[in-house]
């Protein structure tokens, strides 16, 4: 059909893992369902977003983030409307999805910190890319990416952990449905990061501090490596992703 179009869609890379000095996993990736919109297939973006608010239970923060990303995203890029959809979100959208050409639910990778508060002050966390960060990042390198390191090792080693996006050339119809794949360059996962922190010593230090306010730092005097770094009160980094 003359209305079919060839487009290049970015494929975001998975983030590199973070380990302690002995190979214990401290920062992991896992798949979640997200609602995304293709700029190339939606003519009335504001109207579409307004109609999706009650269906996907969008917050004002969701709307603001989406609007910020739309301004800088490539024409062929799929932009996240909401990450980590609930079963209820998915069920409600499935009933009306044909009324939203260009909007679909897809699987994306997000971050998970298996030890919660224990390494929060060391690892930090990732979060949605904000306006200030959008102005600084390389648009090509972050095409299709929603998360970026905010504090801690996640931020300090962002360039190492991020990876390189891939691209997929597809033929799509006027509604944005992919008819066939024409070629693909796979994304490259970010590099893994091994910290000097020792899981065992970190656990002992946290138990010693218990619920008291304060901090404990253990340093190897021979090398200067930090083996444990605990601060109380702590926080659950998973709540910020």
What is the predicted function of each stretch?
Residues 1-215, 230-241:
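Extracytoplasmic/periplasmic proteins that interact with beta-lactams or build/remodel peptidoglycan
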Residues 216-221:
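Short hydrophobic alpha-helical segments used for membrane anchoring or interfacial signaling
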Residues 227:
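Extracellular/periplasmic solute-recognition and catalytic clefts
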């Amino acid at each position: 059909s003359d209305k079919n179009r060839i487009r290049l869609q970015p494929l975001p890379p998975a983030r590199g893992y973070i380990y302690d000095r002995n190979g214990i996993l401290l920062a992991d990736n896992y798949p979640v369902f997200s609602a995304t919109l293709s700029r190339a297939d939606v003519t009335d973006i504001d109207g579409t977003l307004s109609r999706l608010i009650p269906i996907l239970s969008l917050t004002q923060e969701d709307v603001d983030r989406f609007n910020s990303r739309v301004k800088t995203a490539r024409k062929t890029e799929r932009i996240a409307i909401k990450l980590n959809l609930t079963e209820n979100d998915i069920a409600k959208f499935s009933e009306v999805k044909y009324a939203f050409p260009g909007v679909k639910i897809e699987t994306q990778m997000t971050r998970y910190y298996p030890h919660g508060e224990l390494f929060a002050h060391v690892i930090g966390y990732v979060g949605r890319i904000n306006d200030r960060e959008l102005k600084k990042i390389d648009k090509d390198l972050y095409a299709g990416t929603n998360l970026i390191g905010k504090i801690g090792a996640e931020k300090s080693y962002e360039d190492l952990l991020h990876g390189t996006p891939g691209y997929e050339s597809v033929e799509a119809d006027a509604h944005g449905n992919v008819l066939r794949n024409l070629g693909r360059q796979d994304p490259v996962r970010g590099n893994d990061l091994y910290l000097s922190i020792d899981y065992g010593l970190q656990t002992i230090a946290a138990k010693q501090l218990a619920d008291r306010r304060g901090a404990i730092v253990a340093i190897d005097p021979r090398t200067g490596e930090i083996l444990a770094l605990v601060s109380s009160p702590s926080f659950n980094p998973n709540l910020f992703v």
